[in-house]
From Swiss-Prot:
It comes from Parasynechococcus marenigrum (strain WH8102). It is a peripheral membrane protein. GO terms for cellular component: plasma membrane-derived thylakoid membrane. NDH-1 can be composed of about 15 different subunits; different subcomplexes with different compositions have been identified which probably have different functions. The keyword Transport applies. It is an enzyme of class 7 (translocase). This is NAD(P)H-quinone oxidoreductase subunit H. The keyword Transport applies.
């Protein structure tokens, strides 16, 4: 009796760019041996819009509205880093109040970013219910943004060289405190529903494991790096804005798998709430209505009219020239380290403007961690990275 030998030919499968689980126009050319992934080649560039070249032909004030279209889930981070670069080059001070307002906006954006990651990620692995829960909370963040900036999701156009475009409106800090009180129990609700759910844990534990040294070697950042046991957060490392004024911890895990990345992001939302509460209480001058009352009561020369109580140091003229020199500045977004390398030549537009997107770097490790996994695991692993193709392709 002869024994039959079965041999499978490698099969090349095309995922995307039009696929609901691709998180944008990402294309993966995957080589399969049966159901096992042998190789994976990401094809990017479908959403390339030449953002760096646009920046080199615009003044800073003209370019700020563009940047929220890169990472359209977290536009405030790009607004912040784009104004930070000329500020540092020209040594422009930022009032303490403006710095606190920036932190409030950035931490709200971090929560919104993680919520928009959480819903689709869970939908990718088969949990549909939380997808609807997260939009309920994000709406409240959008309402806060709309009150302060006039826009909801993108094109907030709120950050300016030397501060922000306008002070917080009356009653905004109270609304922000209300959101913190509302959202804290909602994180507990998510955890009850998801964290120890046996189906969820069996589905993603052990998937896409990245060792600590691999995470460092591949230049990962954000939750991807911290989930592999490296507690590296630029808010602690670079001491930018006024993060040193607040009491908060860096969220990190050691396992390095999809589940660890989920745990890091959940904890980051809790830490962002801590920062928001402290910033609402400690903001110089307090709520706008209190600050205006102090200025009126105390008249000319009031301390409440001092530098640190202003929302912008000095409104920069449209003819503001970026000094000669070069500089790299970075900050911690919801996805990791985003940075800008700017080269000035004493002109209103930069000579060179290079943007480092966190998810673009984080995506590079995908073929490495997909090999050996099943085809059904591709979407779970890709979802855990948190990519937005607008900033990957730029």
């Amino acid at each position: 009796m002869t024994q039959l030998e079965t041999r499978t030919e490698p099969m090349v499968v095309n995922f995307g760019p039009h696929h609901p689980s691709m998180h944008g126009v990402l294309r993966l050319v995957v080589t399969l041996d049966g159901e096992d992934v042998v190789d994976c080649e990401p094809v990017i560039g479908y959403l390339h819009r030449g953002m760096e070249k646009i920046a080199e032909n615009r003044t800073n004030v003209m370019f700020v509205p563009y940047v929220s279209r890169m990472d359209y889930a977290a536009g405030m981070f790009y607004e912040a880093v784009v104004v930070n670069a000329p500020e540092k080059m020209a040594d422009i001070p930022v009032p303490k109040r403006a710095s606190y307002i920036r932190v409030l906006m950035l931490e709200l954006n971090r929560i919104a970013n993680h919520l928009l990651w959480l819903g689709p990620f869970l939908a990718d692995v088969g949990a549909q219910t939380p997808f609807f829960y997260i939009f309920r909370e994000r709406e409240m963040i959008y309402d806060l943004w709309e009150a302060a900036t006039g826009q909801r999701l993108i094109n907030n156009n709120y950050f300016r060289i030397g501060g922000v475009a306008a002070d917080l409106p009356w009653g905004w800090l109270e609304k922000c405190r209300d959101f913190c009180d509302w959202f804290g129990p909602k994180i507990d609700e998510y955890e009850k529903l998801i964290t120890n759910n046996p189906i969820f844990r069996r589905r993603i534990e052990g998937l896409g494991t990245i060792e600590k040294q691999d995470a460092i070697n591949w230049s990962l950042s954000g939750p991807m790096l911290r989930a592999s046991g490296v507690p590296w957060d630029l808010r602690k490392v670079d001491h930018y804005e006024c993060y040193d004024d607040f009491d908060w911890q860096v969220a990190s895990e050691k396992e390095g798998d999809c589940y660890a990345r989920y745990r890091v992001r959940i904890e980051e939302m809790r830490q962002s709430l801590k920062i928001l509460r402290q910033a609402c209480d400690m903001i110089p001058g307090g709520p706008t209505e209190n600050l205006e009352a102090k200025r009126l009561n105390e008249g000319k020369g009031s301390d409440a009219a001092g530098f640190d109580f202003q929302y912008v140091a000095k409104k920069v003229a449209p003819t503001f020239k970026i000094p000669n020199g070069e500089l790299y500045t970075r900050l911690e977004s919801g996805k990791g380290e985003i940075g800008v390398f700017i080269q000035g030549n004493n002109d209103v537009t930069p000579w060179r403007f290079k943007i480092r997107a966190a998810d673009s770097n984080n995506l590079q490790i995908l073929p490495h961690i997909l090999k050996g996994h099943k085809v059904a695991d591709i979407m779970a692993i890709l979802g855990s990275i948190d990519v937005i193709m607008g900033s990957v392709d730029r």
